[in-house]
């Protein structure tokens, strides 16, 4: 057994392999309809490998030690033969790599090739995370009968588009990915790319932003220029958007995601579409970032994928399995979003308070401030894009500093407002979609509103749960900014406090708003802005949480 793979498999907690003796056929030519030849490797048990179910992975990241040790070898040692193919224009495959644009045609042609091979039996399972999951959606509505299941992990059917929303432009992930892809075929390219995150971050501070790729890699990148110049609703992206195919999937689908994953909203959208269409689908969401998955992903490929490939039923469980943070336990539900959770607003108030009662002109009778006039003045802060509010934890595709972290240092900044409840008398469980409406005004027309939900523990540490950002183009007038936060499943325990942060950025996760109204790719100057957050009876700023009702489903411990 490969030593690196052995160490990874132990860390993932996988069952012992069925065999350690594998045969590897490298650089198998796979012809495409246009004459381009893609290369693939086949991994299979030396004894009895022919006719086993095929796990098909199509990847732009090569066929080297990192991907084979962590994904290919574990499957090939436990009941699959694995085909790992390099996407067009990458790692020996012919043609030019145009991110996401050729995956439908190439994927369908590859499936046709697999079923014609002498070692093929009767079943294929599509499996893989991120880009390797996206390519599954690209062919999902035209699968041949030999495909028995899909297991897309930390991915969605439109991949890039959620980052490029005009009202919430997420810079770090697509830019960082573009930089990584541009240099990955250098010696140790992917590893070097991960280690050069600091250089990439500095590049994202370049003005104008359209020159940031030159700062990072020494030349312009077609993909990076595309993400800077085309918003999500631009027809330019139509060919990479496979959301319309999701409802037409005919095979069982098991989706695996993370609460701090970059693709979570789209992945949950895809799952909801499958459920609404009556498809055989199940969902698993854990406390992970994009780069911090545990063995759940591989176990799902083995338990669910092999069962479907053999015509058997996977081990029984609920259609939706969620890790409820705070409780730190797995729970099963029947659907997403689960029933039994009702929207409850928590209102921002004066002196940094957060409460279920809306703001009133005078404090309620019986309160310590009864009989005194309420402080209804807006809270103010100054946002300077030259010293932007930093991204701390949360939804980021970085090696460290993502996911749940203590936000106390961030909340000490003068450009971050916080609103906090009193210590909770009982647990508050939140599962589902989270949104906020913040009454806001800026000294400039163009401004951003970033909202983060946190859990403040008994020691006073503030742990981020979920967050989101929206961009405004008429912010110099008092306006209700609607912010869509990441979905979540979290239990705020008795004695803890619920906190809401409000600021105007999270850089470099989201691009800086220069305040000038110029296009993001060409803006060459930065303007500081004075921001106001209102919380009076006429402007009731609030975050709305899906709070569990008494007797709601999902009480079964799935651990």
Question: What spans do the regions from the language model cover?
Answer:
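A short loop-to-beta-strand scaffold at the N-terminal edge of the catalytic core in hydrolase folds
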Residues: 33-45
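Mobile cap/lid helix-loop segments that gate and shape the active-site cleft of serine hydrolases
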Residues: 209-245, 251, 262
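Conserved alpha/beta-hydrolase "acid-adjacent" motif
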Residues: 262-268
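Glycine/threonine-rich phosphate-binding loop and adjacent beta-strand/alpha-helix elements that clamp
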Residues: 3-15, 24-29, 276, 299, ...
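Cap/lid segment of the alpha/beta-hydrolase catalytic domain
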Residues: 45-116, 164, 171, 413, ...
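A catalytic-pocket lid/entrance helix-loop region that shapes and gates access to the active site
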Residues: 127, 134-198, 259-262, 277-308
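Alpha/beta-hydrolase fold nucleophile elbow
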Residues: 118-131
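Short beta-strand/loop motif that positions the catalytic acidic residue
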Residues: 249, 255-257
């Amino acid at each position: 057994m490969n030593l690196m793979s052995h160490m990874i498999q132990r860390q993932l907690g996988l069952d012992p392999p069925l065999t350690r003796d594998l045969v590897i056929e490298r650089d198998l030519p796979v012809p495409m309809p246009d004459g381009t030849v893609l290369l693939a490797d086949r991994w299979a048990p030396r004894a009895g490998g022919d006719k086993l179910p095929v796990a098909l992975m199509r990847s732009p990241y090569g066929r080297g030690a990192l991907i084979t040790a962590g994904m290919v070898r574990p499957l090939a040692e436990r009941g699959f033969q694995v085909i790992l193919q390099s996407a067009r224009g990458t790692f020996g495959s012919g043609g030019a790599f145009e991110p996401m644009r050729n995956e439908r045609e190439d994927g369908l042609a590859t499936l046709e090739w697999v079923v014609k091979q002498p070692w093929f039996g009767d079943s294929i399972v599509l499996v893989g995370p991120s880009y390797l999951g996206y390519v599954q959606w690209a062919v999902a509505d035209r699968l041949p009968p030999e495909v028995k299941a899909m297991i897309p992990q930390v991915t969605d059917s439109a991949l890039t588009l959620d980052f490029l929303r005009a009202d919430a432009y997420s810079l770090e992930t697509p830019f960082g990915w573009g930089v990584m892809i541009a240099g990955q075929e250098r010696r140790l390219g992917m590893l070097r790319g991960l280690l050069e995150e600091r250089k990439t971050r500095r590049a994202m501070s370049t003005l104008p932003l359209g020159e940031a790729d030159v700062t990072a890699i020494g030349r312009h990148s077609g993909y990076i220029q595309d993400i800077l110049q085309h918003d999500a609703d631009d027809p330019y992206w139509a060919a990479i958007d496979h959301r319309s195919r999701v409802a037409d999937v005919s095979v069982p689908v098991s989706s695996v995601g993370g609460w701090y994953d970059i693709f979570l909203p789209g992945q949950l959208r895809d799952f909801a579409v499958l459920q609404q269409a009556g498809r055989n689908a199940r969902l698993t969401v854990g406390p992970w970032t994009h780069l911090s998955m545990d063995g759940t992903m591989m176990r799902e490929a083995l338990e669910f994928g092999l069962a479907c490939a053999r015509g058997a039923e996977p081990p029984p469980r609920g259609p939706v399995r969620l890790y409820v943070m705070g409780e730190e336990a797995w729970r099963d539900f029947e659907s997403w979003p689960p029933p039994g959770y009702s929207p409850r607003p928590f209102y921002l108030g004066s002196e940094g308070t957060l409460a279920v009662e809306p703001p009133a002109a005078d404090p309620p009778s019986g309160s310590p401030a009864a009989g005194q006039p309420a402080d209804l003045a807006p809270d103010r802060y100054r946002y300077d894009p030259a010293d932007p509010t930093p991204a701390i934890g949360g939804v980021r595709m970085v090696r460290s500093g993502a996911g749940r972290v203590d936000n106390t240092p961030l909340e000490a900044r003068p450009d971050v407002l916080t609103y906090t409840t009193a210590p909770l008398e009982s647990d508050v469980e939140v599962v589902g979609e989270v949104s906020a409406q913040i009454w806001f005004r800026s000294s400039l027309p163009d401004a951003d509103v970033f909202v983060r939900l946190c859990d403040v523990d008994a020691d006073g540490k503030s742990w981020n749960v979920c967050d989101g950002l929206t961009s405004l183009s008429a912010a110099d007038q008092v306006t209700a900014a609607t912010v869509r936060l990441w979905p979540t499943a979290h239990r705020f325990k008795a004695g803890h406090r619920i906190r809401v942060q409000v600021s105007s950025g999270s850089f470099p996760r989201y691009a800086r708003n220069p305040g000038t109204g110029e296009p993001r790719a060409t803006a060459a100057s930065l303007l500081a802005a004075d921001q106001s957050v209102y919380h009076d009876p006429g402007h009731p700023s609030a975050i709305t949480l899906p709070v569990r009702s008494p007797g709601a489903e999902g009480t079964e411990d799935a651990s």
